[in-house]
Amino acid sequence: MRVLGGAAILAILFCRLGIGALVDGLRTISGWSLVAAAAVAFVTTVCSALRWSLVARGLGVAVPLRGAIAAYYRSQFLNSALPGGVLGDVHRGLQHGRDAGDVSRGLRAVGWERLAGQAVQVVLALIVLLVLPSPVHSSMPAVLAIAVLCVLGAVGLIRGRPPRGTSRWDRALRTARADVRAGLLAPRTRAAIVLSSVVVVAGHMTTFLIAARTAGATAPVLQMLPLAMLVLLAMTVPTNIGGWGPREGVAAWLFAAAGLGAGQGLAVAAVYGVLVLAASLPGAAVLAITWLGSGNRGSTRAAGSQSEGLAGKADVPHQPVPVAA
């Protein structure tokens, strides 16, 4: 159903706007834009991997930063290439959990790491949308009130008395409280988690601005920033096809509401999608190396087992067969 939702959004956009704006936007992609997007993606990937490494260490399933960077590139490629936009993160959590001997903690570390990044992104988006004019500026007081209520509720769950029941909900709540305190709010790591998340959001916005300029958008940066923030928030909706769907729909609506043209918004979103996919291609190399390595290890184990079996047979003493008189 989620994939169908993303396909429906794209179908509506193409029916109403045609594919001319999309094709024209893709034709503007140049070598410098790809290189710039790849450079920004390297910085954001390192910061994201650092955030994951800090959260995982707090939960007791530490991952070295070098390995975290490679795994994060791989998950970004899978997120960009597969429907839903989260399968790469699920794979990253499962793989790390198996390597660490605790799949549950591995998955939770990835989940909390992504949640921390999205929380910082929401806070920055609220600040930008409150300060700068945008098509949703008039709705921001109500949005801010809802956000404050959500924050107060989360603080109450974290700082309140832990439940003592034995139900599944009580156990899950106790685990979540312990994870947040150890993985996200630990005094030694919380500042680094927030700072790395800020750099990641800034990198995504920079990539969006690169895509906008590449697609021919000439609006001032201060006008583009609120639009970029809203499009980035739309990308967190898992109803997409490899990242495509809600991003293009929201971009087309926002650019039209801002007087920049829906076709321009569709072109910018399409260019952004291509730049992000191209910048994640190192993850494809990591995936291929991992797959080849696992295949070689499997062949080595099979050959070793066969050799041990032959050696065992060779060690069995030969018993002469008696001949009947």
What are these model-predicted stretches?
Residues 91-95, 107-111, 122-123, 239-241:
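Hydrophobic alpha-helical membrane segments of integral membrane proteins
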Residues 1-73, 130-236, 262-325:
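Predominantly cytoplasmic-facing regulatory/coupling regions of multi-pass membrane proteins
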Residues 66-70, 84, 88-89, 98-115, ...:
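Membrane-interface alpha-helices at helix entry/exit sites of multi-pass transporters
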Residues 77, 112-115, 233, 274:
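Transmembrane alpha-helical cores of Major Facilitator Superfamily
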Residues 76-83, 229-244, 248:
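Transmembrane alpha-helix interface/packing and boundary motifs in multi-pass membrane proteins
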Residues 3, 48, 86, 110-111, ...:
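Hydrophobic transmembrane-helix microenvironments that flank and shape a buried ionizable site
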Residues 88-98, 241-256:
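Re-entrant/interfacial helical elements at transmembrane boundaries that shape
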Residues 111-131:
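Hydrophobic alpha-helical transmembrane segments of ABC transporter permease domains
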